């Protein structure tokens, strides 16, 4: 395959935990070409991103200015893709910038509000530019969510516990919110009160997510990403759990997102809609 037929990819947050895995995955993919690596770490500026992530040099320097790197992705025959694993505080502007340049975002950064997602969807539709926002790229997580949707038909009580490393900035996780949304869309009323409740410590029972489903967030060093969906009824407890033991598990989903987003003309929320 000639270089002009490869999908150009920019990775934003290239030196972060997820960004490093994306760089490695894109470098190994025969149909993708890394054309830009963005990271704000001042000690890495100008360094070859391949060497930064511990693989062979890729002749792609680490740069801090997203705008200038997006220009590189617009100079190729095929529309480029920006993969964003950065920070909730900046992801909205990152996605708008990419769409404005005609570069298609694949977003794993969580923390966007419903209104921000709606605004980005309107912007992408007007630009006829594909955009994928996925709370989680692990296929196992999608299977967990599907199993939870099936189970909720038979249980009236459900709560979600999500556990992440203590460097995660947002809580609850996008995956937990998405799971609660999927359950709420089933139209059931969950967790009818059994007694008059009183919290002696505010928030002890977790925050209420979509469908008034309690979500509990835990942040500890030593964790990566984990989630439990707990269903209860008299005499039984049904627990569905997913554990991430290595961030490599997200890469098949990220690569799928890159390949699919170039076919889209607007925003899609959730990787499961592309399967």
Swiss-Prot record:
UniProt-annotated location(s): Cytoplasm
Biological processes, Gene Ontology terms: diaminopimelate biosynthetic process; lysine biosynthetic process via diaminopimelate
Record-listed NAD(+) binding positions: 13-18, 108-110, 134-137
Entry EC no(s): 1.17.1.8
Pathway in which this enzyme or protein is active: Amino-acid biosynthesis; L-lysine biosynthesis via DAP pathway; (S)-tetrahydrodipicolinate from L-aspartate: step 4/4
Active site per UniProt: 164 (proton donor/acceptor), 168 (proton donor)
Keyword Transmembrane on entry: no
Catalysed reactions, as listed in the record: (S)-2,3,4,5-tetrahydrodipicolinate + NAD(+) + H2O = (2S,4S)-4-hydroxy-2,3,4,5-tetrahydrodipicolinate + NADH + H(+); (S)-2,3,4,5-tetrahydrodipicolinate + NADP(+) + H2O = (2S,4S)-4-hydroxy-2,3,4,5-tetrahydrodipicolinate + NADPH + H(+)
Molecular functions (GO terms): 4-hydroxy-tetrahydrodipicolinate reductase; NAD binding; NADP binding; oxidoreductase activity, acting on CH or CH2 groups, NAD or NADP as acceptor
Keyword Ligase tagged: no
Keywords for the protein's UniProt record, in alphabetical order: Amino-acid biosynthesis, Cytoplasm, Diaminopimelate biosynthesis, Lysine biosynthesis, NAD, NADP, Oxidoreductase
Binding site for (S)-2,3,4,5-tetrahydrodipicolinate: 165, 174-175
Assigned GO CC terms: cytosol
InterPro entries cross-referenced by the UniProt entry: DapB_C (IPR022663), DapB_N (IPR000846), DapB_N_CS (IPR022664), DHDPR_bac (IPR023940), NAD(P)-bd_dom_sf (IPR036291)
SUPFAM superfamilies attached to this UniProt entry: Glyceraldehyde-3-phosphate dehydrogenase-like, C-terminal domain (SSF55347), NAD(P)-binding Rossmann-fold domains (SSF51735)
Matching HAMAP family: DapB
Role noted for this protein: Catalyzes the conversion of 4-hydroxy-tetrahydrodipicolinate (HTPA) to tetrahydrodipicolinate.
Name listed for the protein in its UniProt record: 4-hydroxy-tetrahydrodipicolinate reductase
């Amino acid at each position: 395959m000639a270089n002009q037929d490869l999908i150009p990819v920019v990775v934003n947050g290239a030196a972060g935990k997820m960004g490093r895995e994306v760089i490695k995955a894109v470098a190994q993919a025969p149909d993708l070409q890394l054309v830009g690596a963005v990271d704000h770490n001042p000690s890495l500026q100008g360094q070859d991103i391949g060497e930064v992530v511990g693989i062979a040099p890729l002749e792609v320097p680490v740069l801090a200015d997203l705008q200038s790197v997006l220009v590189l992705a617009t100079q190729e025959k095929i529309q480029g893709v920006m993969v964003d694993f950065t920070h909730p505080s900046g992801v909205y502007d990152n996605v708008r910038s990419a769409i404005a340049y005609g570069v298609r975002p694949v977003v794993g950064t969580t923390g966007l509000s419903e209104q921000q997602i709606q605004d980005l969807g309107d912007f992408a539709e007007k630009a006829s530019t594909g955009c994928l926002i996925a709370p989680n790229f692990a296929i196992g997580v999608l299977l967990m969510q599907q199993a939870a949707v099936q189970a909720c038909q038979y249980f009236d009580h459900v709560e979600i516990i999500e556990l992440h490393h203590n460097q995660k900035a947002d809580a609850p996780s996008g995956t937990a919110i998405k799971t609660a949304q999927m359950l709420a869309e089933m139209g059931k009323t969950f967790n009818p009160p059994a007694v008059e409740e009183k919290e002696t410590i505010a928030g002890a029972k977790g925050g209420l997510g979509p469908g008034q489903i309690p979500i509990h967030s835990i942040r500890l060093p030593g964790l990566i990403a984990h989630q439990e969906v707990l269903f209860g009824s008299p005499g039984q407890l049904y627990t569905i759990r997913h554990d991430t033991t290595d961030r490599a598990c997200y890469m098949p989903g990220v690569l799928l997102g890159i390949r699919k987003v170039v076919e889209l003309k607007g925003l899609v929320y959730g990787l499961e809609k592309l399967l």
